[in-house]
């Protein structure tokens, strides 16, 4: 499968199944397109030869021109790449998908909902102000301890285990967070495990003690900020209706500075009111000094005033291109920023099974409520039909777990002809469920956004050769 596009002056050809990315000249670009359309080799050669003058007219003055022998030479190079498995490669992944129901159920990560309550009242919150459409509550140390034991017991021989302190607002239960980290450290050697903790916070509860603890114990922190003050404060208000920007920004800056500017993400949400989200990213970078950035489209039902419209998406796609070009400029000038969704590894990358199955929700990754219930991920919490079991009895809804085992790109017919399927791995099961009522469905707007991100990320990789 081949995907071709032009962006920022680059002719980019992606060979889906090999993962090879080629930056080519105009004649080669057209030759690949014609061959991909099923045109015979000789017809392609004649077509290229008949258009040499047109190709030459596109070449800037002073640069080498095409000659009569170039069409044949280009076709030979394409044939060499094809023989090497770097163009028109075969799908080696689909046969692996049939093994998924038989795969082991090693649990690698937990999302610990230490607080089903929050000190902000964000109107766009998918978690209903941290309560997940249920009652408020804080996780006890005993429940959290059992969750960590459950993770160890079900992690097999895996050494590194991931735990995210989540909510609600986890710092509303900071003492328990501290106790759980201390407990985890106390059992690492005995079980040959290493816990890697992440803290996701709105920043209200950050203190000097929190900063010292997080920078010592958490290998990553996720800091929620939507960007410009007026954008952030539209939705991210406290319980009295006051915007949070002025309170949280100095705390975030202090934490990041103490952290050495590493291993964190500023995580924002853009909505119908700010589809021009690059202005928010650039505000965080240029005015506030943050360099590790992420920005997500809002999760909202159609008709919600915050929900993105089809018209918004066109603006959003333009914004992704603006961001990619600006990141190249910053890299050239020696002041780079990182955007989470443009981080792509073309030399190593995930294993075969990861490329097919994605995040592992419901199998390798689960969310734990304050009361110890298990769900496939945080976006399913509160939906009783998606309860997997609990941390005392383990996974008891085996049929549901088996459904999530089969969550892979080949289980979704709509993904069959998508060039980006081995980058998204079939996409988010929760987004699919909320959009279609089926975890094997497809969230089409999300697909469009994802494909644009990948195109921009690959273009940045192409540009890096010229830096």
Question: Where are these predicted regions, by residue range?
Answer:
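Short Fe-S-cluster ligation motifs
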Residues: 148-166, 404, 442-467
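C-terminal accessory region of radical SAM enzymes
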Residues: 314-348, 378-425
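Short acidic, hydrophobic short linear motifs in intrinsically disordered regions
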Residues: 39-64
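Detector for the c-type heme attachment site
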Residues: 125-131, 261, 419-420, 433
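Conserved alpha-helical substructure of the radical SAM core
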Residues: 66-69, 73-212, 217
